[in-house]
Amino acid sequence: MPTSNQLLRNSRQPVRKTKKTPALRGCPQRRGRCSKVYIINPKKPNSGNRKVARVRLTSGFEITAYIPGVGHNVQEHSVVLVRGGRVKDLPGVRYHIVRGTLDAAGVKDRKQGRSKYGVKKPK
């Protein structure tokens, strides 16, 4: 607990909020180029193979982004759109690749929840 003299000398600093997506620099999405596409395993109670990509963004940051959905066509040198949003069971993965834009195609044969996976309405 500071004394009144200490508070007079220098006032209390407000608590600064940490940004959840610093690499996007305040933008809703950012474009980037994939430098590596690979598989990682999730944290303890979960298991499986999660597809992720290392992406160099136009803001200069190099980030790890999750590739959602079943199957993908993302490979090295693909240009992708990245949005914020972490993956709870993958430490260090705080971004998602947007499916159905640029080089990331939509999920094949998807009928429900299509808007999240970049799939047009079937005829």
UniProtKB/Swiss-Prot annotation:
Keywords per UniProt: Chloroplast, Plastid, Ribonucleoprotein, Ribosomal protein, RNA-binding, rRNA-binding
Biased composition annotated in UniProt, kind: Polar residues: 1-13
Primary gene name: rps12-A
InterPro entries, alphabetized: NA-bd_OB-fold (IPR012340), Ribosomal_uS12 (IPR006032), Ribosomal_uS12_bac (IPR005679)
Bias (Basic residues) ranges: 14-30
Disordered: region residues: 1-30
Organismal lineage: Eukaryota, Viridiplantae, Streptophyta, Embryophyta, Tracheophyta
Function statement: With S4 and S5 plays an important role in translational accuracy. Located at the interface of the 30S and 50S subunits.
Domain of life: Eukaryota
Assigned protein family: Belongs to the universal ribosomal protein uS12 family.
HAMAP family, per the entry: Ribosomal_uS12_B
Protein name (database record): Small ribosomal subunit protein uS12cz/uS12cy/uS12cx/uS12w
GO cellular component, as recorded: chloroplast; small ribosomal subunit
Complexes and interactors: Part of the 30S ribosomal subunit.
Principal subcellular localization: plastid
Species the sequence originates in: Pelargonium hortorum (Common geranium)
Compartment(s): Plastid, Chloroplast
Biological processes, Gene Ontology terms: translation
